[in-house]
Every structure is written in C-alpha cells, then in structure tokens.
Amino acid sequence: MKHLHRLAALLALAATSAFAGPPYLTDDPVPTDTGHWEIYAFAAGEGHGSTLDADAGLDLNYGASPGVQLTATVPLSFAHEPHQGWQSGTGDLELAVKYRFFEEHELGISAAAFPRLILPTAAHAPREHTRMLLPLWAEKDFSGGTSLFGGGGYMINPGRENRDFWQAGVAVTQDVSKRLSLGAEVTRQGSDTDGGTAQTRAGLGSSVQLSDHYALLFSGGPTWADHRTGYHFYAALSLVY
C-alpha cells in the first residue's frame, strides 16, 4: 500500500528524545541521558477522508554512554481504506543509534547523526527489503526557553517501483511554563515511489509534564501529498527514568 510506505517514512522522522523529537516529526540531537530510559507508548498516523494508516506501539530509548542513544521502535499497524475495511498486524521494526558528535554549551549548539534501520516485518504490507534512513540533526537553544532544531537525511528505499528520497524538517519550541511546552514545525519529503509526488507537512505540538517521570505529548496538522490535503497526528505517554 502506497499510504503505508508514506506512514513508515513519517514515523522514521519522528524519532525519540527527551527535550524535542516527540511529539514532532523533526528530531533533535539530544540523546537519552547515560544509564537512563525514555519509553513512549504512542499512536501515530495519517490519512485523508476515510483512508487511515496508523501505528501504535512502544518507542524504547536507552542512554548507552555519554552522547550515545540506542533506540528500538516496536509498532502494531492499522489501516482502513474504502471498499477494503480495516486491516491490522505487526508493523515494521525500527532500530537506530543516535550519536551526538558536537556540543557547545556556551553557544547552546549541538549536532548528531541518527542512522536508522527499518526492517520489513509488517504483516499486512510485507516488504522484501530493509530500508535505511541516514539523517543529521542540529539544535540551537536560546535564553527564555526557546529551541530551534532541524535537519534531515537520505532514505535508502529499495524495491520495485520505489525511490530513494531526501527528507528534512525544522521546528521551534517554547517553554510556556515548567510543565508546558508548545511548538510548530514544517517537514518536506521527496517522492518515495516512481511517479509519486513530494509531501509537505505542517504541525503544531505540545508537551505536558505530568510529574518528574511522566508526560503527555500531542501533535498534528495538515499533509499535502498526491495533489490533495490530508492530516497527520501523534500522541504519546512518555516515561523517563
């Protein structure tokens, strides 16, 4: 299903980090603190009209060493299309390593690589090939609780009628209080199939800190693809310990 190809690319953008990343598609270079876990119970997807492609599952992140984060995303996939009804099954397993290779505290600037493997484990949209995303992410923190982060990378997308493509995003967040952060982002992705079109997404997001360990995260907005307007969304409960 072409829509599921697009959803997988969307979820690959939505990586995991304590200070940005979720709920945004755009990631940041901040890894999980060494010896700590960040776990996200999430639901994410996109659609248009009565068509919906969504994943629900766990994002598991561990701070393996200073500047290094190990990530595994384990989803269940759901899809609905007119005349076909609902389908569900295991999603594509994702494995990634984030490596922060630059950090300047005084300037508030950092950068990281976050290569990601997307394994062909989905039950209702089986693939024969493993995909790989090769992104770079950077961030600038300002006084007053404002952060600007973004970057992008190249998706190696083998398979019949598939195309490799570039994708990029930029986001800005503002700490409104100690427990509330708001943000906005724009992302762009090239065509992932022969004869397909590029995709642009805009979104608003928020993070509500419930306690020292738990937070609620939300984002969503319009998606422009295939000469029509759809929508995308992300919601999660995060646990950091």
State the predicted function of each range.
Residues 19-241:
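Transmembrane beta-barrel domains of Gram-negative outer membranes and organellar outer membranes
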Residues 1-25:
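Cleavable N-terminal export/targeting peptides
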